[in-house]
Amino acid sequence: MDIFYDLIKWLVVLIYWLLIANITYRILIKRRSIPSSMSWLLTIYIIPFIGIAIWFFFGELYLGKRQKKIAKKIWSISNTYLNKLKSYKYIFQIKNSEVATSLFQLCKHRQGIYGIKNNKITLLTNTQNTIEVLIRDIYSARNNIEMVFYIWKPGGIADDVAMALIDSAKRGVHCRLMLDSAGSVEFFRSPWFDIMKKSGIEIVEALKVSLIRIFLRRLDVRQHRKIILIDNYISYSGSMNLVDPYLFKQSSGVGQWIDLMTRIEGPVATAIGIIYSCDWEIETGFKILPKLPNKEMLKKKCNQNSSIQVIASGPGFPKNVIHQALLTAIYSARNELIMTTPYLVPSDDLLHAICTAAQRGVKVSIIIPLYHDSILVKWASRVFFSELLEAGVKIYQFKKGLLHSKSILIDQQLSLIGTVNLDMRSLWLNFEITLVIDDRKFSHHLSAIQKEYIDNSRLLDKNTWSMRAYWTRILEKIFYFLSPLL
C-alpha cells in the first residue's frame, strides 16, 4: 500500500512539473511583453496548482474549437466583400488631413479599406437623449435593425427600446440582437428574452458562460462592442450600454454613468455592418453580409471634408490593430492630446508614447473618473500616475458620476471614439470597435464635451500626489505586479 501511495505521489509531482514546463514554454514562445511574461511566470511558480488553474482560465486567448475555426477564415471572406465596396470610389477619402494621414494609412494596410466619406455625423452626449433618438429611428426602420451590446439591463427606458423593437418586428422589420452572455445576464434571466424572441426578434447570446465552457475556452474574452445598424444607412457606436442611466448600478455609489455615442448617416454603415456580420457568423455560423450602399442616395449627400475609418479588434480580426492605431495616433499629435477613459491600465508602449508626447511639447491631458466601479482597476490605474505626472501629463479626475466615455482628440482635428478602454483586456482580448474620424467640425464638438468633463473634474496635483501615504504606495506596487494580468 505504501508503494502505491508513493507511486501516486510521484505521479502527481511529475504531472505538476510537466504542466509547469508546458506553460513556461507557452509563455516564452508567445512573445508577450516582459512584464506580462514575468507576472505569469511568478504566478505559476509561486502559487502551486492555483497558478496553473489561473493560467488555463485566463492565460490563453482561446475561443473554442468551432468559433476559433470560423474566426480564422471570416476576415479573409469579408475582405472579398470589401473589394466589391471599393467599386464605389467616390465614397472613399484618398487624402486626409496631415495629422490623420499616418493612422488612415495604417488602417488601409491592415484592414484593406480607405477612410469612408459622404457621412453625416452627430455626437450624442446624453444617454437619455440618445435612447430617445434611437427609438425614433427604430420606429422609422423599413427593412432591418441589428444591434450588439455588452450590457442590456431591463428596466426604465431600456424597456421602451425593447417595445420599439417588438413593434418593428411585428410590422415586418428584420430585427437581430446580439448580447454578451456575462454582461447581459440579467436580460437573459428576465421575461424580456422570451417576449422578444416570440415577437420574431433573432437573439444571440454571445460567448456563453457556463461551468462546462470553463474547460473549453477563456471566459474573460467578452463581446464588448456597442453597435446599432438601421436599414444599412444609419449606424450608432460608442461607449453606451443599453441601460437606463437613472437605474443602472446606482447602489455602487458612483453616480450616473456618463457616455458618448455617435449617430451616423451614410455608407460607413456598410463597413460597420461587415463587422457585425463577422460577429454574427462566429456565434451562429450564418453569414448576414449587408447590402451594398444605394449609389443614388449617397451622391446626394457627398461630404468631401471628413472621413471615417472603422477599426475592429478581437479574436479573428487583424492582430494588435487597435494597439497599433492608438500608438500611431498618439505619435501623430503635435500640439494637443486629450484622452478620456474609465480604466487607465496602459501597456508599456502606450505609457511610453503618452509620456514622450508630453516631453516633446504636446499638451497632454487624461480625463478619468474619480469614482470607480472596480477596486482592482482603481488601484492598478494609480500605479501609472507618478510617471505620467513627472512627464508633464495633466490628469483630471471627473467628479460628477462614473465617466464611461472612451475618446481621444488630437490637435483639434482627429477623433477616436468607441468601446476601447486603455486597459489590457480591451487592447488584447475583447471584441471592440473604434471609429477614427478626420473632421475638424466634429472634433470641435468633441473638444467642447471634453472641456465640460474637465470643468467638472479636479486636477491631480503632482506635489500632493508625491506625499500620499506609504501604505498606498505598497498597494500600488502590488497592483503594478497584477496589472499585466488585468
From Swiss-Prot:
The chain crosses the membrane at residues 3-23, 38-58. PROSITE patterns: PLD (PS50035). InterPro entries: Cardiolipin_synthase, CL_synthase_A, PLD-like_dom, PLipase_D/transphosphatidylase. It comes from Buchnera aphidicola subsp. Schizaphis graminum (strain Sg). The lineage of its organism: Bacteria, Pseudomonadati, Pseudomonadota, Gammaproteobacteria, Enterobacterales. Its EC number is 2.7.8.-. GO terms for biological process: cardiolipin biosynthetic process. This is Cardiolipin synthase A. It is found in: Cell inner membrane. Residues 219-246, 399-426 form the PLD phosphodiesterase domain.
